[in-house]
Amino acid sequence: MRRSAAAYQKFTEDEIRQANSVDILSLARGYGYEPEKAGRKAVHMKHSGGLYIFPENNRFFQWTGPDDGIKGGAIDFVMREENLSFPKAVGKLIGKEYAAEARQVTPYEKKERGPLVLPEKADNMKRAYWYLVSIRGISPQIVSHFMNRKMIYQEKKYGNCVFVGYDAEGTPRYCSMRAARENSSFKMDATGSDKSYPFFHEGTSDLLIVTEAPIDLMSHASITADFYGRDWMEDHRISTGCLWNGAIDRYLEGHPQIRRLVFAVDNDYLARDKDGQFRNWGQLTAAKWVREYTGRGFQCAVHVPHLNDFNTDLMERRKGRTVEDLDRLRMAELEAEFNRDAAEEPENEDEQEMET
């Protein structure tokens, strides 16, 4: 008797490979997406908030929007679209019942977000505090400020740093986690997080400073206080959690006194697109936001970090480096990248003919 998808508990490597071999572009059409060519290797899904599919290696990547950074193969795609567990997604992809469903083109519907599930709190916050102050270089007073407001705490199970965004009634609506370990890249949002509710500091001026991540927000504030002697609390500050402006718009709705915006997002000067071309996603987005919000009557400016982000700037400044030193570091990184490209570039066909 054939097992249903729900009956699968474990899968062989061949079964997982079979599930991941299902064509993602066909899956996307089945979910109601409309493909359009976006480059030599990428296919963009219209009205998707930045969903790109790469048929050559059967992968997808979400560049912007609330799901910014989500990527993977066919299994991950089905898990994302239908909010399924890994076993159910694999069973759906390799089961006969899936083949019948995949041929049906149904309108795409964004799945309703479930309730926010906050990680359990640890008994203390020593590890999170140590990581943010000693490893990330953030001012102790600033870390304590957010911890005292229950916007930062330490997760009980793994010791991760937890950052919480609240709505106007004080209800947690957004939660992101970051490993409190040096050299770890782990970070993720908690189940049910709504990125339109930012991690924030409510100031008193008419200026809002927009960063990408909570650590960026606190790093920018630390630079303001420790290196320029200004009151970091005077201005409003939010982190968007991605390169999507949902959090900006929601914060502006609740703070009509704000008339000036500073976009202090990442300086992705070494980032590349899927075709290998340099693409400074952070600054491209900042330029787009300047155009949009200037058109809406706001005074806008961009504060570009010298290195990749303001936390990198802060950590280097803590070592005694000047802003001129940071600029030299950036130029050295770019020069090394350009030299690497030049070394890998194939010889010109005309030059090859001359040598023969």
Give the location of each predicted region.
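Basic, glycine-enriched DNA-binding surface that flanks or lies within the catalytic cores of DNA
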Residues: M1-A7, Y108-D194, F199-E202
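Terminal peptide-recognition signature
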Residues: Q62-G65, V78, L132, F163, ...
